[in-house]
């Protein structure tokens, strides 16, 4: 049943830059992605992505309104 799930509201985006890693163990990547469809076509967003990701990957976004906060500098 889970295989039949289709996100009709999802929009494709292409990863154009990887800004860094975040999360307690570094499992979240912060990426800049270019929206490829919908009303925000061509817009570039900063998003947090869980899991392995590389330049040129396509990700599906359920919404394109929110943008991730920029990563802060690491404290020593």
Swiss-Prot record:
Molecular function GO labels: structural constituent of ribosome
A Pfam family matched in the record: Ribosomal_S28e
CC per GO annotation: cytosolic small ribosomal subunit
InterPro entries from the UniProt entry: NA-bd_OB-fold (IPR012340), Ribosomal_eS28 (IPR000289), Ribosomal_eS28_CS (IPR028626)
GO biological processes: maturation of SSU-rRNA; ribosomal small subunit assembly; translation
Alphabetical keyword list: Ribonucleoprotein, Ribosomal protein
PANTHER family per UniProt: 40S RIBOSOMAL PROTEIN S28, SMALL RIBOSOMAL SUBUNIT PROTEIN ES28
Family: Belongs to the eukaryotic ribosomal protein eS28 family.
Designated name of the protein: Small ribosomal subunit protein eS28
The organism of origin for this protein: Methanococcus maripaludis (strain C7 / ATCC BAA-1331)
């Amino acid at each position: 049943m889970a295989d039949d799930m289709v996100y009709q509201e999802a929009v494709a985006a292409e990863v154009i830059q990887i800004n860094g890693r975040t999360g307690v163990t570094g499992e979240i990547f912060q990426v800049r992605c270019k929206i490829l469809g919908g009303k925000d076509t061509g817009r570039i967003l900063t998003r947090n992505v869980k899991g392995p990701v590389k330049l040129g990957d396509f990700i599906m976004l359920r919404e394109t309104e929110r943008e991730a906060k920029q990563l802060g500098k690491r404290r020593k």
